[in-house]
A protein has these predicted regions:
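N-terminal phosphate-binding or glycine-rich loops at protein starts, especially the Walker A/P-loop
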Residues: 1-43
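Short glycine/serine/threonine-rich phosphate/pyrophosphate-binding segments
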Residues: 13-17, 42, 80-94, 98-112, ...
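Glycine-rich phosphate/diphosphate-binding loop of Rossmann-like nucleotide-binding domains
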Residues: 15-16, 28-34, 40, 147-209, ...
Length: 342
């Protein structure tokens, strides 16, 4: 299993991307990594960690990097040798099995589209983010690839999300919900209203109707379907809420009496367990579903821990043949069966 890493992507590259790759290789004997980017910088980090001669770690030179503030389309046209582009080409040319792309989400999506192409029947790929809930994990998609979706895009997302949830959650018939401002089928904007009856009439997904934002942390369904604008707002709010609540608890304890501090010590193990369960860094990243290859988008602020996890998830998705499952699903039903352009 060989994974291509955009070693120059993200706020802490290349240090954290390289360290995370080292950790993944050390922990998984079947994984090899190809670090794409500035050879000298990458080699220096490998050498400092006694991994410069590891046969399962190689370096592939890329002379350019796409920054977080650059326009994705323009950057890809100007920077043909950008690390994310080169990493994607390694999968396209069958030299690697998957890509890990921290950094600019827009650039990553564009690189995947141009480099790998779309699966037949998919108009737009979606980012499928695992969301921690009280009952486990819920897959939310789209969480940032497309800000203006049509009903057909949401339908395609529901199909891909259902297949992903089967692999991720191990559920034979995962439940699917459409994110809306109310549970009634008559509520919502034009896109959601048009999407509802299509999902309701499909036999290959277990559609449970509309859900509201408050239902997500409850784990009401296994798959939450929404457009990328709404999904990204929900995702960022959830990340900020966990951080804010954690700080609020700490501040309250420090400002409390000696009895409050003693009580905090007693519940500390439970609080740490809860914090770990809600920590988005535990998930590593999110797959971009709908392109012809396993493509993991990692958080721009990813540290070594998240990179390692993203690599392991990517390896698992390749082994479980997620791309093949999506192709088969799109051939059976879904966007190929319905004649709609709205």
């Amino acid at each position: 299993m060989k994974i291509a890493i955009d070693a120059m992507g993200g706020d802490f590259a290349p240090m954290e991307t390289v360290l995370g790759s080292i950790e993944a290789v050390r922990a998984n004997q079947h994984i090899e990594v190809v670090l794409v980017g500035d050879e000298q910088q990458i080699f220096d980090i490998l050498e400092a960690n006694n991994e410069a001669k590891n046969p399962r770690i190689s370096v592939h030179y890329a002379s350019q990097v796409i920054g977080m503030d650059e326009h994705p389309g323009q950057a890809l046209r100007k920077k043909k040798d950008a690390s994310v582009v080169v990493a994607t080409s390694l999968v396209r040319d069958n030299r690697c099995d998957a890509v890990i792309a921290p950094g600019s989400t827009g650039a990553a999506v564009a690189a995947a589209l141009f480099g790998l192409g779309r699966i037949k029947g998919i108009d737009r790929p979606v980012i499928a983010t695992p969301m921690p809930t009280v009952s486990g994990i819920t897959v939310m998609l789209d969480s940032g690839a497309n800000s203006n979706s049509k009903p057909k895009h949401l339908v395609q997302g529901a199909l891909m999300g259902s297949e992903y949830a089967k692999l991720l959650l191990g559920k034979e018939n995962p439940t699917v919900g459409l994110l809306n401002i109310g549970e009634e089928a008559t509520k919502g904007n034009d896109v959601v209203l048009a999407t509802y009856p299509i999902l309701e009439g499909m036999k290959t997904i277990n559609f449970k109707g509309n859900i509201e934002g408050r239902d997500i942390p409850k784990g009401a369904v296994d798959v939450v379907v929404c457009d990328g604008f709404v999904g990204n707002v929900v995702l960022k709010f959830a990340e900020g809420l966990v951080t804010g609540l954690t700080q609020l608890v700490k501040d309250s304890i420090m400002a409390g009496s000696i009895f409050a501090k003693i009580g905090a010590m007693l519940v500390k193990p439970a609080l740490k367990k809860m914090a770990k369960r809600l920590d988005h860094t535990e998930n590593g990243g999110a797959p971009l579903l709908g392109v012809n290859g396993v493509f993991m988008i990692a958080h721009g602020s990813s540290k070594a821990k998240e990179i390692k996890t993203a690599i392991e998830i990517a390896s698992d998705l390749v082994e479980r043949k997620i791309i093949q499952h999506i192709r088969e699903t799109m051939d059976i039903e879904g966007a190929l069966k319905y004649d709609y352009d709205e």
